[in-house]
Amino acid sequence: KIISEDNFYVFLDEVQNVPGFQRAVDSLYIKKNVDVYITGSNAYLLSGELATLLSGRYIEIKMLPLSFKEYVSAFDNNNYQQLFLDYMRNGGMPGNINILKSNVNDLDKYLDGIFSTIVYKDIMARNNITDKLLLESVIKYIFDSIGSPISIKKISDTLTSKGISTSNHTVENYITALLESFLIYKAERFDVKGKNLLARDYKYYVVDSGLRSYLLGKKADSDMGHILENIVYLELLRRGYKVYVGKVDDLEVDFVAENRDGLRYYQVALTVRDEKVLERELRSLQKTGDHYPKTLLTLDMDLETDYDGIKKINVVDWLLSDE
């Protein structure tokens, strides 16, 4: 109980695990000399009764692992290209920094702790999920398919063919739990010309490439293009955009980023040194039919280039910029 007239700052972490916490938070909030900060690792925090009690009276700040710009600020090394390759592999969880500076062999232990907490406490315990094998199989499938359009039926059929019994309904419930725990994110498909959302074959992205590397092992390194895409997706979220996958006729724009200023289009590729690859990556951006900014992001070390209004930028430079 606070009876003093002094100013107080109250920090509550994972308070959703305490029965009746909503009323306690509300009683603190109504005091003029108290600022309340609530942190949590899943979407349940602002669901239900608390959202009703605090409706219109709170600001939600969504947090993600370290951006590449934040990551490099912790190192004296200014070889950004090498640091970026490390970032692609190890991810941006804050604890990575000290581990990479001291004993890199401890990295998997650290990531295992994070993964176990999310899966066993935030997901299994809260959702009364008992089939650990099935849940981990769904997670591995999505982690292995980042940046590719997938359906619930496709996941269910694939797992069933491997002898893991499940149903579309169960897979859908598991994916909902993964989304609410912020382990994965869903990018809906956006019809660029019709300016409307399409209701199938979403793409999913993982919250941290290091967690993906931990879970998939060496297999994780076989798809660097989609890892790069995943990093760009998360960076667009950090910059305050709603992010969709664009459809233009029979072509695809990797990302349509939307904010109050309008749209931006992004295409992501490891390299476009091959002329045919360059033409392919530019084609979907050229067909959008509007004048919103269009950017092609690659790992190529060339100088920034302009192709009739489409900017080609090195992705490391873009990540370090304030666009």
Predicted regions and their residues:
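Conserved P-loop NTPase "ATPase switch" module shared by AAA+ and STAND
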Residues: 4-21
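Nucleic-acid nuclease catalytic cores
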Residues: 248, 290-309
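Structural recognition of the conserved hydrophobic beta-strand(s) that form the central parallel beta-sheet
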Residues: 11, 35-41, 62
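Active-site ExK catalytic segment of metal-dependent nucleases
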Residues: 262-273
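Domain-level recognition of nuclease-like catalytic cores that cleave nucleotide substrates
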Residues: 301-323
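Interdomain motor-coupling "hinge/lid" segment immediately C-terminal to the ATP-binding subdomain
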Residues: 41-43, 47-149, 185
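Conserved catalytic/switch belt of AAA+ P-loop NTPases
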Residues: 22-38, 51-52
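Accessory nucleic acid-recognition modules appended to NTPase machines
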Residues: 103-263
